[in-house]
Swiss-Prot record:
The gene is murC. Cell wall formation. Gene3D superfamilies: Mur ligase, C-terminal domain, Mur-like, catalytic domain, NAD(P)-binding Rossmann-like Domain. Disulfide bonds: none annotated. This is UDP-N-acetylmuramate--L-alanine ligase. Keywords: ATP-binding, Cell cycle, Cell division, Cell shape, Cell wall biogenesis/degradation, Cytoplasm, Ligase, Nucleotide-binding, Peptidoglycan synthesis.
Length: 447
C-alpha cells in the first residue's frame, strides 16, 4: 500500500513510518523542518519532503496525519479533494497493533520509559518484540525496535482521547493525574477516558496497573480481563526500595530477590515492576524479567547526563508536569555530590498547562536549591493574557520552603546566568518538553 504521512518528523509518526516501510508499504512523508527523525527515515529509504505542498501527496492510497496538522494543511486539503482516506496517527498505530499481540502502555507519566523497559526486558528474555516508543532509546539511538510482527509494544497517547482507537490484547496503566488542560476540562474526564480504554480490553487479554494510584485501583474493577497490580505500598508485584537504583522484589507474600536497575528513582522502580508484570503475563519469571533491566540504558532526555565540567554536573530531563518534576528532583538530590546544590532550569510547556497548574509547579520546585524559569514554550498554542513564566516564579515565591528564584525570559541569556550561579559539586538540571536542553549544552561549552 502507498502511504503518505503528514507531520512525519515527530517521534510517534516517524516510528510508524519506519515500521510500515519495513513491512513492505511504500511510504512517503512531509514535515515543516528537518530533524534527526526525518534524516533517519530518509536513510531508511522513506521519501521525506521538507515543507507542505499538495503535489507531495502523490498517488497515495491512504494519508496519515499527526495531531499537530491543521485543517488548512495543503496536503490534507488535497487528500480530501481527491477522496483519499485520511486517518489519524492513532488509527495507523491501532492497525499495527491489530496485526499481532499488541501491548499498549498508557498513563499520565512514565509511558516512554515503561514502554522502553518492556521492550528491553522482552528482548533479553528472547521474545524479540517490535516496539514503538515516544522517545529515543539510548542503547540503540532510535525510537523503534524491529522484531516479530506478532508481538508489538507501543506507547499509547491519552492527550486527545486517541487512545480509544487502540484495541490491544494487553495494557499497562502507570498512573492517572490531571494533564492536557487544552483537551480535558477536569480530572474526571481524564479518568473516564482511561476507564473506556480499560473496558475495551478483550476477556482473554491482560491489564497491568499501579496499585499505589487510587484511580488506577478503581479501574481494576472495570477490567473485563485478568489484572496484575504492582507498587511500592501494595500489589501482587511489590518493591521495597533499597537505594536510588535497587530494590527487593516481592511476589505476593513471597520475597523473591534483589534487583538492580540501570536507571535511578522510585518512579523507575515502578516502571520496572510494570515491565515485570507484562513479562509474567507472557510466562516469564518476574524476578528474571526485572533483573534484565540492570543493563537498561535509559531514554534520551530522561535524567540524561549531558556532561560535567569544572565540577558542575549538567543533566537534562523531559519532565513538564509537577509530579514528574518532583520525581526528577528527588533523583537529582539522591545522586548529587555531598553539599552540592540542585539548580533547576524550567521551561514551562504550553500556556494552557501553565495556567492550570502554576500553583502545583510552585510547590514542586521546593525540592531544589535554586530555580531558573524562562518563558513558556507554546508548542503551537497562542499566548494567553497573564500567562508567562512569571506566573510560575510568583508561585514558587509563595511557598514556605522557597529556593532562590531567577526569572530569565530571554532563553539566550540562560547559559551565562547559569554559569554565574553554579559552582563545583552543583547539579544543573534542565526541565521541560520544549527546547530547553540546549541551555545545558551551551552552559557546558562556557564552563
Amino acid at each position: 500500500m502507498k502511504v503518505h504521512m503528514i507531520g512525519v518528523g515527530g517521534a510517534g509518526m516517524s516510528g510508524i513510518a519506519e515500521v510500515l516501510a519495513r513491512r513492505g508499504h511504500e511510504v512517503t512523508g512531509s514535515d515543516l523542518k528537518e530533524s534527526p527523525y526525518t534524516r533517519r527515515l530518509a536513510a531508511a529509504g522513506v521519501k521525506v519532503y521538507i515543507g507542505h505542498e499538495a503535489r507531495q501527496v502523490g498517488d497515495a492510497e491512504v494519508v496519515v496525519i499527526s495531531t499537530a496538522i491543521p485543517k488548512t494543511n495543503p496536503e490534507l486539503l488535497e487528500a480530501r479533494r481527491r477522496s483519499i482516506p485520511v486517518i489519524p496517527r492513532a488509527e495507523a498505530l491501532a492497525r499495527i497493533l491489530a496485526e499481532g499481540r499488541g501491548i499498549a502502555v498508557a498513563g499520565t507519566h512514565g509511558k516512554t520509559t515503561t514502554t522502553s523497559m518492556i521492550a528491553h526486558s522482552l528482548r533479553a528474555l528472547g521474545e524479540n518484540p517490535t516496539a514503538l516508543v515516544g522517545g529515543e532509546l539510548n542503547d540503540i539511538g532510535s525510537n523503534v525496535i524491529f522484531g516479530r510482527e506478532d508481538l508489538i509494544v507501543a506507547e499509547a497517547d491519552e492527550s486527545d482521547r486517541s487512545i480509544l482507537r487502540l484495541h490491544p490484547q494487553a495494557a499497562v496503566i502507570t498512573n492517572i493525574e490531571y494533564d492536557h488542560p487544552d483537551f480535558y476540562a477536569s480530572l474526571e474526564e481524564v479518568v473516564e477516558t482511561f476507564a473506556r480504554f480499560v473496558a475495551g480490553l478483550p476477556p482473554e487479554g491482560h491489564l497491568v496497573l499501579c496499585a499505589d494510584d487510587p484511580r488506577c485501583r478503581r479501574l481494576a474493577e472495570l477490567a473485563p480481563c485478568p489484572v496484575t497490580t504492582y507498587g511500592l505500598s501494595g500489589g501482587e508485584l511489590r518493591a521495597r526500595v533499597l537505594s536510588p537504583g535497587s530494590y527487593l522484589l516481592f511476589e505476593g507474600a513471597r520475597k523473591r530477590g534483589e534487583v538492580s536497575l540501570g536507571v535511578y528513582g522510585r518512579h523507575n522502580v515502578l516502571n520496572s515492576l510494570a515491565a515485570a508484570g507484562i513479562a509474567r503475563w507472557l510466562g516469564h519469571d518476574p524476578l528474571e524479567a526485572a533483573r534484565t533491566l540492570g543493563s537498561f540504558g535509559g531514554v534520551r532526555r530522561r535524567f540524561q547526563l549531558k556532561g560535567e565540567r569544572s565540577g558542575v554536573r549538567v543533566v537534562d530531563d523531559y519532565a513538564h508536569h509537577p509530579t514528574e518534576i518532583m520525581a526528577i528532583l528527588d533523583v537529582a538530590r539522591a545522586t548529587a555530590a555531598p553539599e552540592g546544590r540542585i539548580i533547576a532550569v524550567f521551561q514551562p510547556h504550553r500556556y494552557s498547562r501553565t495556567r492550570k497548574l502554576y500553583r502545583e509547579f510552585g510547590r514542586a520546585f521546593g525540592r531544589a536549591d535554586a530555580v531558573v524559569v524562562t518563558e513558556v514554550y507554546g508548542a503551537g498554542e497562542m499566548p494567553q493574557p497573564g500567562v508567562s513564566g512569571k506566573l510560575v516564579v510568583d508561585a514558587i515565591c509563595e511557598t514556605s520552603d522557597r529556593p532562590e528564584v531567577y526569572y530569565v525570559p530571554d532563553q539566550e541569556a540562560l547559559p551565562e546566568v547559569l554559569r554565574m550561579i553554579s559552582g563545583p559539586r552543583d547539579t544543573v538540571i534542565t526541565l521541560g518538553a520544549g527546547d530547553i536542553s540546549r541551555a545545558g549544552e551551551e552552559l557546558l561549552a562556557r564552563l
